[in-house]
Each structure stands twice: as structure tokens, then as C-alpha cells.
């Protein structure tokens, strides 16, 4: 194998390794590169330098986009808070246990729809792989429970994954824009709404990657339908959490490095004024607000998934940049040794020729 092929193969594997895991591979032994010509070594050094510039630029772009993704989550929070407040107060006005709303109607579970949110691009570490592994695990659990299931895939990576596995029933594969919008969440909301209301499925679960920190994201499963009329978010085990209690994540800089500050806040809901009167039946208002709340929860999951993907890409590109720096260092050492050996050999030849002429 020539020097060019050898170092090309290693640099490609190093970049692929950084894209699939943050664990760094060991660089090639310099002894393997000593046999290469100086021209090949210079070519490889230039190639690795260019790769380093690309990965470093992708790291900086991902870091900037993470900030914007977090700002999007924070900016959309007031609307969600106000919507939850209305749901709380509406629930106090009426007896929700005695009414029948389509999105809160519970029935024996025979079929489950699993909505899987993945990324639109690669080079983001194990982000997509972790979500898809979680999906496979959940599918196995549903099989063991004897339940039917169908998958709604959102994201190019998930779409390609499930399309290569025809044994997994795929209800629909959707793609979203690079920055999640209400239009994207509305398409998902309309699909799961029709599946649940038409009783094609009895339960809808949402699988996405929750943003924890810049180096960690946890794939979680949340029950979308049936919904809780009290504005609660429930997991697959039926454990519900107050939606007004949330963790804010602030992306800041500390000692020249990006870090995340976490702060748990509790939002106090204020009751409506006694003079407030509803022109329509409260049940009709609640029936109209629940789909809107469902849409806001899907949009929130899309935004969190995007933030997790960008953080994973930033970490992967940082590791790839470190690998490129280390490979460039080893190639430079091999180049200098080869150049020194060549110069020493030429000097010895000159000295030997001079001695021969003198003798």
C-alpha cells in the first residue's frame, strides 16, 4: 500500500470514527510512513490540513446553531405557558372527568403508533444511532406485550433506516426543514390526530432526543395521545409530570469554553378574573385548545431534537479536528525524518565520492 492510500484510509476512518463515536482512534505508526516519498507526505499533510479546516468550521457553525436552537425553545415557551394556563383554568371551570373529548379518550390499547424523530444529516456522532436503537428496543417491547404497532418516521436518517427494513410497518415517512416550524409540527399533528381519532391506533408515543448538555442527549419516549386535559406530559409508564415545571438550559461560556447552566423553574398559573365569561361552551373551547397544545408539544420536541443533533455534531467535529491535528503531527514527524535521512544520505555520498577522488 502506498503512502497516499495508507494515510487516506486512516484519515477517512478517523473522520468516520469521530462521526460515529467520540472515542478517538490511535494514529498510525510513523514507521509505516517512512517508506513514502517526500512528495506524497507533503500531499497528505496538505490534505489533512484542509480536512482540519473543514471540521473546525463545521464545529463553529454547529456551536452557533445550538445557540439559535436554544433561543427558539426559549422564545416559544411563553406561548406554551399561556396555553397551559388556559388549560388549567378551563379544567377548573368544568368537570373534565365527566366529559368526553376525542384527544383525552382512553380505550384498551391494541395498536400503538411510534413517532420517531431523527436528524436530517449525519456527522453528528451517535445521535441518530441512539434514537434508532431506542426505537428498536421499544418495538421489541411492544411485540412482547402482544401489541400491534406502526412507525411514523420524521427525518431523513430515520426514513432511510426504516425503508431498508420492510419488516417494520411504516405508516408514513416525513421530512422537516433545517429549522423546525409550526408547519412541520402541524403535519405530524394532523397525521397522529387522524390516526387516533379514527381509532386506527389506540395510543401514540413520541420518541425524540432530549437535550441534556452539550455532550449528552437522552432518547426518551413520551405519550402524545391520549392527552391529559390538565396540561401534563406522561411517559409510557403512565407517570405524568406537570408541564409548567421545566428545566431551562442556558448556553454560556465559562473559561473560554461552551457550557450549559441548568435552572429548574416552576410557573405559577393565575386564575381567571371572575368577570371573565366564555362566549362558547367551555367543552368546545377545550376541544379546540387540545390540538393546539398537541402541536406545541410536537414543535417543542422537534426543537429539542435539533438542539441535541447540533450539540452532537459540534462534539463529533471537535473530536475529528483533534484527530486531524494528531495525524498531521505524525505525518510532519515522518516527513522531517524522511527529509533528514535523505539529506544525510546525500552528504555521505558526497563525502564518499570525495574520499574516492582523494584516494
Swiss-Prot record:
Active site, UniProt feature: 124
GO biological process: proton motive force-driven ATP synthesis
Entry GO terms, CC: chloroplast thylakoid membrane; proton-transporting ATP synthase complex
Cysteine-cysteine disulfides: 234-240
Keyword Disulfide bond tagged: yes
Coiled coil spans: none
Cited Pfam families: ATP-synt
UniProt keyword terms in alphabetical order: ATP synthesis, CF(1), Chloroplast, Disulfide bond, Hydrogen ion transport, Ion transport, Membrane, Plastid, Thylakoid, Transit peptide, Transport
Subcellular location: Plastid, Chloroplast thylakoid membrane
Keyword Chloroplast: yes
Transit peptide interval: 1-35
Topology in the lipid bilayer: Peripheral membrane protein
Highest rank taxon of the organism: Eukaryota
An MF annotation (GO) of this entry: proton-transporting ATP synthase activity, rotational mechanism
Subunit comment: F-type ATPases have 2 components, CF(1) - the catalytic core - and CF(0) - the membrane proton channel. CF(1) has five subunits: alpha(3), beta(3), gamma(1), delta(1), epsilon(1). CF(0) has four main subunits: a, b, b' and c.
Function: Produces ATP from ADP in the presence of a proton gradient across the membrane. The gamma chain is believed to be important in regulating ATPase activity and the flow of protons through the CF(0) complex. Inceptin is a proteolytic fragment produced by insect larvae that previously ingested the protein. This peptide mediate plant perception of herbivory through the induction of volatile, phenylpropanoid and protease inhibitor defenses such as ethylene, jasmonic acid and salicylic acid for example.
Family statement: Belongs to the ATPase gamma chain family.
PANTHER family, per database record: ATP SYNTHASE GAMMA CHAIN, ATP SYNTHASE GAMMA CHAIN, CHLOROPLASTIC
Name used for this protein in its record: ATP synthase subunit gamma, chloroplastic
Organism, scientific name: Zea mays (Maize)
Amino acid at each position: 500500500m502506498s503512502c497516499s492510500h495508507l494515510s487516506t484510509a486512516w484519515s477517512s476512518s478517523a473522520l468516520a470514527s469521530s462521526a460515529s463515536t467520540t472515542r478517538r482512534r490511535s494514529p498510525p505508526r510513523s514507521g509505516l510512513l517512512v517508506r513514502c516519498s517526500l512528495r506524497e507526505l507533503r500531499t497528505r499533510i496538505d490534505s489533512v490540513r484542509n480536512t482540519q479546516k473543514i471540521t473546525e468550521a463545521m464545529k463553529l457553525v454547529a456551536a452557533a446553531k445550538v445557540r439559535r436552537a436554544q433561543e427558539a425553545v426559549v422564545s416559544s415557551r411563553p406561548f406554551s405557558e399561556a396555553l397551559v394556563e388556559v388549560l388549567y383554568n378551563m379544567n377548573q371551570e368544568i368537570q373534565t372527568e365527566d366529559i368526553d373529548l376525542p384527544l383525552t379518550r382512553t380505550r384498551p390499547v391494541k395498536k400503538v403508533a411510534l413517532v420517531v424523530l431523527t436528524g436530517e444529516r449525519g456527522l453528528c456522532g451517535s445521535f441518530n444511532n441512539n434514537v434508532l436503537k431506542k426505537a428498536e428496543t421499544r418495538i421489541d417491547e411492544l411485540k412482547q406485550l402482544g401489541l400491534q404497532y406502526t412507525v411514523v418516521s420524521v427525518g431523513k436518517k430515520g426514513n432511510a433506516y426504516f425503508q431498508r427494513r420492510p419488516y417494520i410497518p411504516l405508516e408514513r415517512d416525513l421530512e422537516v426543514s433545517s429549522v423546525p416550524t409550526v408547519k412541520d409540527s402541524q403535519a405530524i399533528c394532523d397525521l397522529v390526530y387522524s390516526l387516533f381519532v379514527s381509532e386506527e391506533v389506540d395510543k401514540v408515543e413520541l420518541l425524540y432526543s432530549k437535550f441534556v448538555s452539550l455532550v449528552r442527549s437522552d432518547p426518551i419516549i413520551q405519550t402524545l395521545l391520549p392527552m391529559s386535559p390538565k396540561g401534563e406530559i406522561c411517559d409510557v409508564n403512565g407517570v405524568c409530570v406537570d408541564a409548567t415545571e421545566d428545566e431551562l438550559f442556558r448556553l454560556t461560556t465559562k473559561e473560554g469554553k461552551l457550557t450549559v447552566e441548568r435552572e429548574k423553574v416552576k410557573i405559577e398559573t393565575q386564575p381567571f378574573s371572575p368577570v371573565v365569561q366564555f362566549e362558547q361552551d367551555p367543552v368546545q373551547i377545550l376541544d379546540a385548545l387540545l390540538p393546539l397544545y398537541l402541536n406545541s408539544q410536537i414543535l417543542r420536541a422537534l426543537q429539542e431534537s435539533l438542539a441535541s443533533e447540533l450539540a452532537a455534531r459540534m462534539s463529533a467535529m471537535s473530536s475529528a479536528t483533534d484527530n486531524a491535528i494528531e495525524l498531521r503531527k505524525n505525518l510532519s514527524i515522518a516527513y522531517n525524518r524522511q527529509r533528514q535521512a535523505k539529506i544525510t544520505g546525500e552528504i555521505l555520498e558526497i563525502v564518499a565520492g570525495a574520499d574516492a577522488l582523494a584516494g
